[in-house]
Amino acid sequence: EIKKYCNESNLNFQPIDLRWGVSNEAQLDQKTLELCLEEVRESKINPHPNFLIMAGDRYGWIPLPYLIEKSEYEAIVTNIEKEEDKELLNIWYKLDENQIPASYILCERKNEFVEYLNWEKVENQLRDILQSSVNKTSLSKNDKEKYFMSATEHEVIEGIFKYLNTTPFQESILQQNKTLLQIDSENVYAYIRNIKSIDESYKNNFI
Protein backbone atom coordinates (compact mmCIF):
# COMPACT_ATOMS: atom_id res chain seq x y z
CA GLU A 1 0.00 0.00 0.00
CA ILE A 2 2.83 2.40 0.81
CA LYS A 3 4.56 1.67 -2.49
CA LYS A 4 1.29 2.15 -4.39
CA TYR A 5 0.66 5.45 -2.63
CA CYS A 6 4.17 6.67 -3.43
CA ASN A 7 3.86 5.68 -7.09
CA GLU A 8 0.65 7.69 -7.36
CA SER A 9 2.58 10.69 -6.01
CA ASN A 10 5.53 10.15 -8.39
CA LEU A 11 7.74 9.05 -5.51
CA ASN A 12 10.00 6.02 -5.25
CA PHE A 13 9.58 3.98 -2.07
CA GLN A 14 12.69 1.93 -1.30
CA PRO A 15 12.50 0.26 2.12
CA ILE A 16 15.78 -0.83 3.71
CA ASP A 17 15.94 -3.31 6.58
CA LEU A 18 19.03 -2.29 8.52
CA ARG A 19 19.15 -5.66 10.29
CA TRP A 20 19.49 -7.70 7.10
CA GLY A 21 22.28 -7.71 4.58
CA VAL A 22 25.12 -7.04 7.02
CA SER A 23 27.95 -9.31 5.93
CA ASN A 24 29.46 -11.94 8.21
CA GLU A 25 32.80 -10.13 7.93
CA ALA A 26 31.27 -6.91 9.24
CA GLN A 27 29.63 -8.72 12.13
CA LEU A 28 32.87 -10.45 13.10
CA ASP A 29 34.74 -7.13 12.83
CA GLN A 30 32.19 -5.56 15.21
CA LYS A 31 31.15 -3.07 12.48
CA THR A 32 27.41 -3.85 12.38
CA LEU A 33 26.22 -0.64 14.03
CA GLU A 34 28.53 1.59 12.00
CA LEU A 35 27.27 0.05 8.75
CA CYS A 36 23.67 0.67 9.81
CA LEU A 37 24.42 4.29 10.73
CA GLU A 38 26.22 4.81 7.42
CA GLU A 39 23.11 3.60 5.59
CA VAL A 40 21.07 6.20 7.48
CA ARG A 41 23.60 8.91 6.53
CA GLU A 42 23.40 7.85 2.89
CA SER A 43 19.62 8.28 2.94
CA LYS A 44 20.07 11.98 3.75
CA ILE A 45 21.46 12.60 0.28
CA ASN A 46 17.91 12.52 -1.10
CA PRO A 47 16.11 15.89 -0.93
CA HIS A 48 12.68 14.41 -0.22
CA PRO A 49 11.51 12.79 3.04
CA ASN A 50 14.05 10.09 3.62
CA PHE A 51 13.76 8.66 7.12
CA LEU A 52 10.70 6.79 8.34
CA ILE A 53 10.70 4.54 11.37
CA MET A 54 7.92 2.12 12.27
CA ALA A 55 8.70 1.17 15.85
CA GLY A 56 7.11 -1.41 18.09
CA ASP A 57 7.54 -2.14 21.79
CA ARG A 58 10.90 -3.91 21.53
CA TYR A 59 13.84 -1.72 22.51
CA GLY A 60 16.25 -3.97 20.67
CA TRP A 61 19.88 -4.99 20.71
CA ILE A 62 22.29 -2.82 22.72
CA PRO A 63 25.66 -2.98 20.95
CA LEU A 64 29.00 -2.67 22.69
CA PRO A 65 30.87 0.55 21.86
CA TYR A 66 33.30 -0.21 19.05
CA LEU A 67 35.65 2.56 20.20
CA ILE A 68 36.23 4.04 23.67
CA GLU A 69 38.61 6.95 24.11
CA LYS A 70 41.59 6.11 26.31
CA SER A 71 40.74 8.52 29.15
CA GLU A 72 37.14 7.30 29.22
CA TYR A 73 38.15 3.64 29.17
CA GLU A 74 40.61 4.13 32.02
CA ALA A 75 37.96 5.93 34.07
CA ILE A 76 35.66 2.95 33.60
CA VAL A 77 38.32 0.37 34.46
CA THR A 78 39.18 2.26 37.65
CA ASN A 79 35.63 1.65 38.86
CA ILE A 80 35.57 -2.09 38.16
CA GLU A 81 35.77 -3.98 41.45
CA LYS A 82 36.38 -7.57 40.29
CA GLU A 83 39.76 -8.39 38.78
CA GLU A 84 38.24 -11.03 36.50
CA ASP A 85 35.95 -8.36 35.04
CA LYS A 86 38.94 -6.11 34.35
CA GLU A 87 40.75 -9.00 32.71
CA LEU A 88 37.79 -9.83 30.49
CA LEU A 89 37.44 -6.21 29.40
CA ASN A 90 41.16 -5.95 28.66
CA ILE A 91 41.01 -9.14 26.58
CA TRP A 92 38.40 -7.68 24.26
CA TYR A 93 39.41 -4.00 24.18
CA LYS A 94 42.91 -3.15 22.93
CA LEU A 95 44.61 0.25 22.90
CA ASP A 96 45.13 1.75 19.44
CA GLU A 97 47.63 4.62 19.60
CA ASN A 98 47.02 5.40 15.92
CA GLN A 99 43.53 6.63 16.72
CA ILE A 100 43.19 10.36 17.34
CA PRO A 101 42.69 10.60 20.23
CA ALA A 102 44.15 7.26 21.35
CA SER A 103 41.33 4.81 21.97
CA TYR A 104 40.53 1.26 22.94
CA ILE A 105 39.02 -0.77 20.09
CA LEU A 106 36.71 -3.76 20.41
CA CYS A 107 38.50 -6.83 19.04
CA GLU A 108 37.11 -8.86 16.17
CA ARG A 109 35.49 -12.18 16.88
CA LYS A 110 37.74 -15.17 16.21
CA ASN A 111 37.95 -18.90 16.85
CA GLU A 112 35.06 -20.16 18.98
CA PHE A 113 33.54 -16.66 19.12
CA VAL A 114 32.72 -16.77 15.42
CA GLU A 115 29.75 -18.82 16.60
CA TYR A 116 27.17 -16.24 17.74
CA LEU A 117 25.89 -18.20 20.74
CA ASN A 118 29.41 -18.30 22.18
CA TRP A 119 29.90 -14.60 21.52
CA GLU A 120 26.50 -13.62 22.91
CA LYS A 121 27.44 -14.83 26.39
CA VAL A 122 30.67 -12.78 26.40
CA GLU A 123 28.92 -9.77 24.85
CA ASN A 124 26.35 -9.77 27.65
CA GLN A 125 29.11 -9.99 30.27
CA LEU A 126 31.02 -7.10 28.72
CA ARG A 127 27.88 -5.00 28.49
CA ASP A 128 27.05 -5.60 32.16
CA ILE A 129 30.60 -4.70 33.21
CA LEU A 130 30.62 -1.48 31.19
CA GLN A 131 27.15 -0.38 32.25
CA SER A 132 27.66 -0.99 35.96
CA SER A 133 31.09 0.67 35.95
CA VAL A 134 30.32 3.70 33.79
CA ASN A 135 27.59 4.74 36.21
CA LYS A 136 30.23 5.07 38.93
CA THR A 137 32.33 7.48 36.90
CA SER A 138 32.09 11.26 36.65
CA LEU A 139 31.52 11.10 32.90
CA SER A 140 28.80 13.32 31.48
CA LYS A 141 25.30 12.02 30.86
CA ASN A 142 25.89 12.08 27.10
CA ASP A 143 29.08 10.05 27.44
CA LYS A 144 27.31 7.45 29.56
CA GLU A 145 24.27 7.09 27.32
CA LYS A 146 26.02 5.21 24.52
CA TYR A 147 26.57 2.25 26.84
CA PHE A 148 22.82 1.85 27.28
CA MET A 149 21.44 2.79 23.85
CA SER A 150 20.00 0.25 21.44
CA ALA A 151 21.07 0.17 17.81
CA THR A 152 17.61 1.43 16.88
CA GLU A 153 17.95 4.46 19.14
CA HIS A 154 21.36 5.22 17.63
CA GLU A 155 19.75 5.12 14.18
CA VAL A 156 16.87 7.38 15.20
CA ILE A 157 19.29 9.95 16.62
CA GLU A 158 21.38 9.79 13.45
CA GLY A 159 18.34 9.99 11.18
CA ILE A 160 16.32 12.66 12.97
CA PHE A 161 18.15 14.62 15.63
CA LYS A 162 21.31 15.07 13.57
CA TYR A 163 19.34 16.29 10.59
CA LEU A 164 17.69 19.45 11.82
CA ASN A 165 18.65 21.85 9.02
CA THR A 166 15.81 22.44 6.60
CA THR A 167 16.41 21.10 3.09
CA PRO A 168 15.38 23.16 0.01
CA PHE A 169 12.47 20.79 -0.56
CA GLN A 170 11.28 21.16 3.04
CA GLU A 171 11.61 24.93 2.75
CA SER A 172 9.41 24.95 -0.35
CA ILE A 173 6.75 22.93 1.50
CA LEU A 174 6.85 25.37 4.40
CA GLN A 175 6.39 28.30 2.03
CA GLN A 176 3.40 26.61 0.40
CA ASN A 177 1.71 25.89 3.71
CA LYS A 178 1.54 28.98 5.90
CA THR A 179 0.15 26.96 8.80
CA LEU A 180 3.38 25.00 9.02
CA LEU A 181 5.32 28.24 9.22
CA GLN A 182 3.62 28.94 12.55
CA ILE A 183 5.15 25.78 14.02
CA ASP A 184 8.46 26.13 15.83
CA SER A 185 10.28 23.95 13.32
CA GLU A 186 13.53 24.15 15.26
CA ASN A 187 11.95 22.00 17.97
CA VAL A 188 9.97 19.62 15.76
CA TYR A 189 12.06 16.55 15.14
CA ALA A 190 9.43 14.10 13.97
CA TYR A 191 5.78 13.57 13.21
CA ILE A 192 4.26 10.49 14.82
CA ARG A 193 1.33 8.67 13.26
CA ASN A 194 -0.47 5.64 14.64
CA ILE A 195 -1.51 3.00 12.13
CA LYS A 196 -5.20 2.19 12.49
CA SER A 197 -7.36 -0.65 11.19
CA ILE A 198 -4.55 -3.09 10.42
CA ASP A 199 -5.99 -6.32 9.07
CA GLU A 200 -5.88 -8.99 11.80
CA SER A 201 -4.11 -11.40 9.45
CA TYR A 202 -1.14 -9.01 9.22
CA LYS A 203 -0.72 -8.17 12.90
CA ASN A 204 1.55 -11.11 13.61
CA ASN A 205 4.00 -9.76 11.03
CA PHE A 206 4.83 -6.83 13.28
CA ILE A 207 7.15 -7.15 16.29
Predicted regions span which residues?
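Conserved catalytic or regulatory cores that recognize and/or transform ribose-phosphate-containing ligands
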Residues: 1-207
